[in-house]
C-alpha cells in the first residue's frame, strides 16, 4: 500500500516531564502513524503541550474550560489536508496510566484519531459516525502493531 505524503512539523511546548514525552514521540514514528491514517497528502503540525496551554486552547476554541487529550484544527481537507493537532501531555499520560496502555500506544491512537478528524471524520455527530471512526482507528492501529484502544 502506497502511503500519502506528509509534511510534518513536530513541536514541544514547555511542561514538566517533556523529555519523557519526547522519547515516546520520535519524529519517524509520529510521521508513520499519521501517514497510515491519511487518505490524502497532508501538511500537519503536531504540538505537544502542557496543561495550561491545553486548557487555554480548549477554552478559547471549544468553550470547554479544561485540558483535553487532543484538539484538531482542520483548515483544508481532500485533496490536500492541512491541520494542527494539539496533544496535552499530562492528560495523555494520565489516560495511558489509567487505561494500562503505554504512553507511545496512547499517543499513536490519539494521533490517528486527530488525523481522522482532520479529514472530516466526527464521532460526535451520531452513533453510526462514531462506529465508523472507531472501526477505522482499530484497523489502522492494528496495521501499526497496536492493540484495540477501545478494550
Curated annotation (Swiss-Prot):
Function of the molecule: Single strand-specific metallo-endoribonuclease involved in late-stage 70S ribosome quality control and in maturation of the 3' terminus of the 16S rRNA.
Entry-linked InterPro entries: MetalPrtase_cat_dom_sf_prd, YbeY, YbeY_CS
Source organism per UniProt: Polaromonas naphthalenivorans (strain CJ2)
Protein name in the entry: Endoribonuclease YbeY
Keyword 4Fe-4S carried by entry: no
Record-stated family: Belongs to the endoribonuclease YbeY family.
Keywords linked to the UniProt accession: Cytoplasm, Endonuclease, Hydrolase, Metal-binding, Nuclease, Ribosome biogenesis, rRNA processing, Zinc
GO-annotated cellular components: cytoplasm
Residues where Zn(2+) binds: 113, 117, 123
Gene: ybeY
GO terms for MF: metalloendopeptidase activity; RNA endonuclease activity; zinc ion binding
